[in-house]
Amino acid sequence: MKRFLHLLLLLALVPSLLALPPRLRAERPGPVVLLLDAEALREEAQSQGKSLLEVLESYRPLGVRGVAFPERLVKDWVGQGELLYRSGRELLEAGLPAKPNWYYLRGNRELLELLQAAYDLPHEWVGPWLGFPLDVQAFPAFYPLEEVRAAKEAGFFVAVRPINQRYRRLDASLPIVPKEADAVVFAGLEALGYPYRLEEAQERVPVPVALIEGTPQPGLAAYREKGILRLFSLRYEWQLTLTPEEAADKYVLAARERGHQLLYLRPYPYRQDTEHLLRRIQEGLEASHIPLGHPVVREFTPSPLRLAAWVGVVSGLGLLALGLSVYGPGVAFLLLLLALGYAGSQAGALLAALVFPVLGFLGPRNGLWMWLRTLGYALAGTVFLSALGSTPETILGLQAFKGVSLTLLVPPLLVALSFLDRNYKETLTRLFLHPLRLGEVALAGMALALLLLALLRRGNEAPLVPDLELKLRSLLQDLMVRP
């Protein structure tokens, strides 16, 4: 029976390997664009008495080919001097027939007319003042459209960041996504139109949307037909704790190892640091042969051959059932139920990750050959996992792999179970009566500490990162291995 299962496993490897090239082509890095945040750059422009476009042009030789415009709030226009903002009580005391519990705006007439149509709220004009019954200072209020046009005419890749707000109107006449935009990067923690107006909002977005690494945005999957571009950014507070070299290495790693196409940057307080950051990114991208340019939406059609990997996974599950001397079939059946119930459509990939690292330990424990056998099974499991995990959702980053914690816990438990023989009660009794030694306790404690560290480090934002791990990551990165 074992020979038959091994034969099936080997036969399943061939179509599974043939199913991988489409995924490799779809995940090929580049082209990428360096996007500077327009509002973060504005302080530098104002301090030098220059326009935003002039400062952008000064960064073009350093690889910057794009600019992102976050949508402004009403209070941003007030702070810039384009609008005046007064409560109704103030206007009433000034002799105007305003409503005391309303709020009023005055200033740029073109902008006021846009705001009049922007919100699903009652409004009124009191002379030159536009009034609303709610305090609209934190309401979305479009973009500096002249700067958007100028950046586009200068050849920059333009991204806009609309804000989702329950009172905003999604009207085609409003510049929610200006026609100059090349991509949309939703601001905040949810996509435009979420939760009840996604269908209407999709009509306002004619360009690809960005998937921000590490920032789930409910409703984003509804825009899949528009095209998905993967974006990497560092939270600015965290960026300030990093040197330009450290930050640049993270951007290069994101483009090289995770296929990010939009690198979203905010300048450091000192221009010298920003220039150093950009130079380092350019050098890293060139060394990795990743071109700068206009990012394109990745198209991926899974190969039907990937389904053959299920034969390999089921064969591996059968080998596990036969290899465990205690409750082997029961354990294999429970793993199958766990994978189907927890991971759903990703059950095959999860089973490959849980089962194949263990198979090498189920045969004869003959030193080096056991480890070589274990390596072979693990590589086969990697092929099956990659084949079954090759779906458009995973390639685009819309669906994360389910079961990372299980892959850290279950294989060691299965290996421990493999050491029990059929007379497991006698083995457990002997283990219970075994006299403890200080060295054994120390080794067990070290093993538990390492397991705990692995669990803590499984996510993208872990609570602790030892210095030794950072040094190891840096070394692996220099050797072109993803840490």
Task: Name these PLM-found stretches.
Residues 1-26:
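Hydrophobic alpha-helical transmembrane signal-anchor segments
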Residues 24-302:
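Soluble extramembrane regions of membrane proteins in the secretory/endomembrane system
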Residues 2-11, 307-483:
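Alpha-helical transmembrane segments of integral membrane proteins
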Residues 17-29, 456-464:
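Hydrophobic alpha-helical transmembrane segments in integral membrane proteins
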